[in-house]
């Protein structure tokens, strides 16, 4: 299913719901957790705008990273970076996601999720526009951190928004969001190099142009900015956007820890892939444009699969079999990169693309492992922040191993080795239970 048909299908669902009035009741408190939606025209407009905001937000959550991966060699030469510093650069995304992502639930309680996501999109716009023209490695890192801060809070709040606005369509909406995220990731990887050549060959221009897409994503969230997390019960527009944290000790839950480690290991593999895979192919003799296209193939595999996997996962009581299947594809892809990186490059790109769909699976499990949207907010913040913190050393270590070994054998062996514990904790995270029950015990 392509992106347009998926969007049309979701719009059809919204249209069928226009004449209904629904209140979502919290199992924890017994009180309405969502808003009672009245006024078919207002509801239809709000829901369509929200879906547009979710899709545009998802499109902007990876181009800041994959566009840099496609031009990493040019950026290194232009700023005089060593291999170790470049490895540090590829570790900045998970570091920012860990540091800033943990603040997202608190910010959402105070200002409302819509306000925070709108500010996040503005931060991405500013960071992408500034970073190519700072003229130094330190400035480049600082501007990248600004953009990644916006990505971090939006990463955490997307499952919360899906759970609150679409509690009976978590799998479908997560699939739509994940599919748009994969599309943005793949597009940046595929078109950054040729677009840079068309625009005159300057890597600065090739990176800065992605600020335009981020600016477009600010607009749908502006109507949701007026909520400050304290709307009266009859306000109708944003009552349910407030995220009240439950009295839940999330660290008592084994599932929350398993999900956090799974999130961290899949993020490690994903950011190593986005930051280094194009360089692996280039070092194997593949042309720079083709290497970027191969990275795009890896990313674009997530477009259809990111829609299918969450829906399939939502229908299964245990997501372990999906975890194992994705892990097996990753192991096969790494083996191919090690043995014949250039000869079978397209096959390895496809296999690693399938394996990278662990990300939408992890997001789906976040939505399924908690009963309430407040629980999802806390679980999402914990799993993503802890997971991204765990993923920080991976890309940096790959850069160090590459520089000191003079080849890709050791880095690829590291990537393959990390896939084994990822599969193990993924099976644990996929068990049919909730963090509320585990924390209570």
Model-derived segments and spans:
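Extracytoplasmic gate region of multi-pass secondary transporters
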Residues: 68-69, 254-297, 303-304
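C-terminal transmembrane helical hairpin of 12-TM major facilitator-type secondary transporters
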Residues: 319-362
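Conserved MFS/SLC helix-loop-helix module at the cytosolic interface between two early adjacent transmembrane helices
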Residues: 99-138
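Cytoplasmic helix-loop-helix junction between adjacent transmembrane helices
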Residues: 143-181
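Helix-loop-helix hairpin linking two adjacent transmembrane segments in secondary transporters
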Residues: 168-169, 176-229
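A late C-terminal transmembrane helix in Major Facilitator Superfamily
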Residues: 370-408, 415
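Juxtamembrane intracellular "pre-TM" segments in multi-pass secondary transporters
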Residues: 34-43, 226-259
